[in-house]
Swiss-Prot record:
Main location per the UniProt record: membrane
Keyword Signal belongs to the record: yes
Keywords: Glycoprotein, Membrane, Receptor, Signal, Transmembrane, Transmembrane helix
Positions bearing carbohydrate: N47
InterPro entries in the record: GPCR_Fz/Smo-like
Name of the gene this protein is made from: fscE
Signal peptide: 1-23
GO cellular component: membrane
Protein name, entry field: Frizzled/smoothened-like sans CRD protein E
Ranges of the Cytoplasmic topological domain: 105-120, 188-203, 270-289, 372-443
Compositional bias (Low complexity): 397-410, 419-432
Stated family: Belongs to the G-protein coupled receptor Fz/Smo family.
Length: 443
């Protein structure tokens, strides 16, 4: 009889405790004292002596407990995080080599600096910006063995500005993104100026170049003083943490550049529409590739802007889902596998967001690498016009000499540094926007 009474009391106690737990979902998160050293998986126990200091270096405590969120965050599953990081490795590596090839091609290492135009300088800055941003975000060839440790130095700790690797990669990433964005906008304006045949002085172009780089430096190093660089929940690299800094130092400039790009595209299309069919055909043949690239990158920038705006507006919703999952973990601490996290950020949308910048490396290769102009730059370079080539590959050398002789006898001169290629008197010697030999389209 006594044993039955004890069983009944134990059963009643269990039911009573469960009732308390379910009647106050935030009970554990907001004040429950857990047994020392205990946190239900995948949460991590942090034995802290200075809670605020631990928060400052990247630990994300759950309520008043000593449990911290795992790193990477619970927004995605570990498998989904691996997919995004592996994508950054594969797509980033391909784009990296593509961009290195293009930068070498259009740099003084291969391309004669006398042939430089506004457009040449613009695309070099664009290529360099994309390369810098892409090689400092996500997973790279040289840190495969680090896994998540690059951005999660300790279990449950998100890297912060105090971690030197995080600070360096964040600065380069921000610098690369802003550089690529501002010069993309500049190229879109330059394309319209070229079609309108507006003359831009070399001095004005140099002033603009200096101003753009000063703005880039300010937007990059401004947040350092407020210790704003770090690894956050939905990112795959260190970047700006607080919303107001993200908006002020990046997304506001993005919005401005998108407006500039959109206006430029409308003006370009208007100019092409207003000319005769014969001139229109020539303009399209000459400018179609850069125009397509500008529009394609505009689409990607707009997608990234919309995705960021949407996820930011749903931030509280995502927080509530994570909180419900954490409460479930505490309630079912003995069997946490029964807890399933609800839908937060769309894995596919998040995947494509980070893929966009890596696609840009492949896109510029398609529009600027696989062209006649790229081949001409290499064939005219020192690398194909030296004693070794003349000795062992005389056919290539004689072909280059013949083309050079024809250009000289034709009386052509190279366009000035401040001019874009289509404004110069020499379409073959300067960098074509479209990579198409302009002389073949002259009436």
């Amino acid at each position: 009889m006594i044993s039955h009474i004890k069983k009944f009391i134990n059963l009643y106690t269990i039911v009573f405790l469960l009732y308390i737990l379910y009647s106050n979902e935030n009970f554990f998160v907001k004040g429950q004292k857990l047994p020392p050293g205990f946190c239900p998986s995948p949460l991590i126990y942090r034995n802290t002596t200075d809670r605020q200091s631990d928060i400052d270096i990247g630990f994300q405590f759950l309520g008043e407990t000593n449990c911290v969120q795992p790193c990477p965050s619970l927004i995605l599953t570990e498998n989904e995080w691996n997919k995004v990081f592996n994508m950054s490795l594969v797509a980033g590596t391909i784009s990296m080599f593509a961009l290195i090839f293009l930068i070498i091609t259009y740099s003084p290492l291969v391309n004669n600096i006398k042939d430089y135009t506004r457009h040449t300088v613009g695309i070099l800055f664009l290529f360099s910006g994309i390369l810098i941003a892409m090689t400092t975000d996500g997973r790279q060839l040289w840190d495969i063995d680090l896994g998540f440790k690059k951005y999660c130095p300790e279990p449950g700790r998100f890297a912060r500005q105090s971690d030197s690797k995080c600070l360096v990669t964040a600065i380069f990433f921000q610098f690369g993104c802003v550089t690529a964005l501002l010069w993309w906008a500049a190229i879109s304006v330059d394309l319209w100026i070229t079609i309108k045949k507006i003359k831009i002085s070399k001095k004005l172009f140099i002033i603009y170049t200096i101003a753009v780089n000063i703005v880039t430096i300010v937007l990059t190093f401004g947040p350092v003083g407020s210790k704003q660089y770090g690894y956050i929940d939905a990112a795959i690299g260190c970047w700006l943490m607080d919303l107001k800094y993200q908006v002020g130092y990046f997304w506001a400039p993005v919005g401005f550049c998108l407006c500039v790009g959109c206006v430029s595209i409308v003006l370009i299309l208007k100019e092409i529409y207003n000319v005769s069919d014969a001139v229109k055909k020539k303009l399209l043949a000459k400018h179609l590739k850069p125009l397509m690239l500008i529009i394609l990158m505009l689409t990607e920038f707009i997608y990234m802007f919309i995705f960021y705006s949407y996820t930011t507006s749903k931030k509280n919703h995502y927080h509530d889902i994570i909180e419900e999952y954490v409460v479930c973990l505490f309630v079912h601490a003995a069997n946490p596998s029964v807890c399933k996290i609800g839908s937060t950020i769309s894995p596919s949308a998040h995947f494509f967001f980070h893929l966009c910048i890596r696609l840009m490396g492949l896109e510029v290769l398609i529009f600027y690498g696989f062209t006649r102009q790229t081949r001409k730059i290499w064939m005219r370079s020192f690398w194909f016009n030296n004693s070794f080539i003349k000795r062992f590959l005389p056919s290539i050398s004689s072909s280059n000499d013949s083309k050079s002789s024809n250009n000289k006898t034709s009386g052509r001169v190279t366009g000035g540094f401040g001019e874009s290629s289509e404004q110069s008197n020499e379409p073959e010697q300067s960098i074509e926007l479209s990579g198409i030999d302009d002389s073949k389209h002259d009436p």
